[in-house]
UniProtKB/Swiss-Prot annotation:
Membrane topology, as annotated: Peripheral membrane protein
Keyword Iron-sulfur: no
The gene coding this protein: lepA
EC number: 3.6.5.n1
Biological role: Required for accurate and efficient protein synthesis under certain stress conditions. May act as a fidelity factor of the translation reaction, by catalyzing a one-codon backward translocation of tRNAs on improperly translocated ribosomes. Back-translocation proceeds from a post-translocation (POST) complex to a pre-translocation (PRE) complex, thus giving elongation factor G a second chance to translocate the tRNAs correctly. Binds to ribosomes in a GTP-dependent manner.
GO biological process, one term: positive regulation of translation
Source superkingdom: Bacteria
Intracellular or extracellular location(s): Cell inner membrane
Domain tr-type G: 6-188
Membership in a protein family: Belongs to the TRAFAC class translation factor GTPase superfamily. Classic translation factor GTPase family. LepA subfamily.
Name the UniProt record assigns to this protein: Elongation factor 4
Organism field: Brucella abortus (strain 2308)
Length: 602
């Protein structure tokens, strides 16, 4: 079934969220007859419910399209649909490494957005040929000429012959297919008789077939019955089936050079298949290994605890299942005095955290509490050693720490001019350092250096509310810098609550401590004794609120009578309250944790 190399095109679609990339993929599949009308549904490549609901792509998907071009030749087009969100940039990087060209989809009414830039630069770094596609051309607000000029000014690629389409109505889709055939290059190199060399693009778990591995063959032929070897891990597996997605799974006899397809080989766990690894034949291995791309490193950490302690084992099982499909999600067990048993989890960013939490709650029917998200700090100890700190509650004694370094990001924000002042003020409040400000038509593009710690809480939400949803934001990690950071503990009735401790910059500690104490005062119910809520840095209290005691009227039964009798009862009540305060436990309701942790700087 191997196709001649010059008739294969491997391409991906690069776009900002909501610019219509999955809809364009739907139209391409429909036009090339990948699915008939009955099987067609919107966003056919977004297979998770959560992807459809939020209108975002999380897992990169692939599909093989057969197209008869206007020149009468038959072509095989391998499309990889990539996510647009910054958290899933590693999905984008592996998709781009398997292609030679990209379609850059830009909304003709909105123009270039921050994540368009991030992903298109990745494509340029991979030496991709880029075809510009202007989508939503049917909207009254569409300004194709302005957007073309913007693409040339901001990205620096020629957009004069951009394909103008409407993915929704199907207008111009044929022109996109012709542009793919005529402008994008065919796969390079590839010798059918050379030893097998293939790149592992992705892998996911299927309950019937085990692990399905998506591969891009570079040299040699991959077919059923071969014993393959993963060059990175040295593991060997017999190939059980080879096939392609149309987007239905279709088995084929073999996969030749330049082709994209899947294999199953009785692999039990996704962790055994490292993305970017080189696959070769065990009997006749290849000499040179492909330069794999770097695995995704977790950036944001938080604790996940079941609301009901009895669900702990279910949560462990659910996380194991999610880990099968998402190698970038990591977790380890932890215990908290306030919340019981749970897990410390690592994520690629806040959207990733939200999606994992939502999938756990939805697919496995679990009720969860998440602790405050934190980033990875580096501690330089006085004895010359270095440590990584994932959980503020585990911070060693301040005396042993020489300095603390925190991760900084380079953030690119694109916004209409009207909101520029408010956004710059927000970045300044978050300790941002302005690097650059340029204008592209009526939109401003600002570049800031920001501490990641200030972004993980609610920066994105605040940015969207300040700009009424018009600003777009993209970031990448730049480096670690020393900061004046302190651990803030929250004490309830003079007992520290580990789930609420956090590392904050000294300048913001008092403000955040006061806000958290005020919030907890509203959320913790009154007890029979007075409860102090304090925010402390080391031994110093920086904020305090007091929940007053419930008062039982102990003198109600004294009808008139001697005042000393009343005083005796009141004194007795006072004594027992004092004792209660000493030994009584404050019950902090689960809702209080959830609400307090949702709190930003508002």
């Amino acid at each position: 079934m191997s196709t001649p190399l010059d008739h294969i095109r491997n391409f991906s679609i690069v776009a900002h969220i909501d610019h219509g990339k999955s809809t364009l993929a739907d139209r391409l599949i429909q036009l090339t007859g990948g699915l008939d009308t009955r099987e067609m549904k919107d966003q056919v490549l977004d297979s998770m419910d959560i992807e459809r609901e939020r209108g975002i792509t999380i897992k990169a998907q692939t599909v093989r399209l057969s197209y008869k071009a206007k020149n009468g030749e038959d072509y095989v087009l391998n499309l990889i649909d990539t996510p647009g969100h910054v958290d899933f940039a590693y999905e984008v990087s592996r998709s781009l490494a398997a292609c030679e060209g990209s379609l850059l989809v830009v909304d003709a009414s909105q123009g270039v957005e921050a994540q368009t830039l991030a992903n298109v630069y990745q494509a340029i770094d991979n030496n991709h040929e880029i075809v510009v596609v202007l989508n939503k051309i049917d909207l009254p607000a569409a300004e194709p000429e302005r957007v073309k000029q913007q693409i040339e000014e901001v990205i620096g690629i020629d957009a004069s012959d951009a394909v103008e389409i409407s993915a929704k109505t199907g207008l111009g889709i044929e022109d996109v297919l012709e542009a793919i055939v005529n402008k994008l290059p065919a796969p390079k190199e590839g010798d059918r008789n050379a030893p097998l060399k293939a790149m592992l693009v992705d892998s996911w778990y299927d309950s019937y077939l085990g692990v399905i591995v998506l591969v891009r063959v570079i040299d040699g032929v991959l077919k059923k019955g071969q014993t393959i070897r993963m060059m990175g891990t040295g593991a060997k597996y017999p190939v059980e089936r080879t096939g392609v997605f149309t987007p239905k799974m279709v088995q084929v006899d073999d996969l030749g050079p330049g082709e994209l397809g899947f294999i199953t080989a009785s692999i039990k766990e996704v962790a055994d298949t490292r993305v970017g690894d080189t696959i070769t034949e065990d009997r006749r291995p290849t000499e040179n290994i492909l330069s794999g791309f770097k695995p995704a490193q977790p950036v944001v950490f938080c604790g996940l605890f079941p609301v009901d302690a009895a669900d702990f084992e279910d949560l462990r099982g659910a996380m194991g299942k999610l880990r099968l499909n998402d190698a970038s999600f990591s977790f380890e067990m932890e215990t908290s005095a306030a919340l019981g048993f749970g897990f410390r989890c690592g994520f690629l960013g806040l959207l990733h955290l939200e999606i994992i939490q939502e999938r756990l709650e939805r697919e496995f029917n679990l009720d969860l509490i998440t602790t405050a998200p934190s980033v990875v700090y580096r501690l330089n100890m006085t004895d010359g050693t270095h440590k990584e700190l994932h959980n503020p509650a585990d911070m060693p004694d301040v005396v042993k720490i020489a300095s603390i370094e925190e991760p900084w990001i380079k953030a690119t924000i694109m916004t209409p001019d009207d909101y520029l002042g408010a956004i710059m003020k927000l970045c300044q409040e978050r300790r941002g350092i302005q690097i650059d400000l340029t204008y592209v038509g009526p939109r401003a593009m600002i570049t800031y250096d920001l501490p990641l710690n200030e972004v993980v809480f609610d920066f994105y939400d605040r940015l969207k509310s300040i700009s009424k949803g018009y600003a777009s934001f993209d970031y990448n990690l730049s480096d670690y810098r020393e900061g004046d950071l302190v651990k803030m503990s929250i004490l309830v009735n003079e007992e520290p609550v580990d789930a609420l401790s956090m590392l904050v910059h000294r300048s913001a500690a008092e403000k955040r401590g006061r806000a958290l104490c005020e919030k907890l005062k509203e959320l913790i119910p009154q007890h029979m004794f007075k409860i102090p809520i304090q925010a402390a840095i080391g031994g110093r209290i920086v904020a305090r609120e007091t929940i007053s005691a419930l008062r039982k009227d102990v003198t109600a039964k004294c009808y008139g009578g001697d005042v000393t009798r009343k005083r005796k009862l009141l004194e007795k009540q006072k004594e027992s309250k004092k004792r209660m305060r000493q030994f009584g436990k404050v019950e902090i309701p689960q809702e209080a944790f959830i609400q307090a942790l949702k709190m930003g700087d508002d």
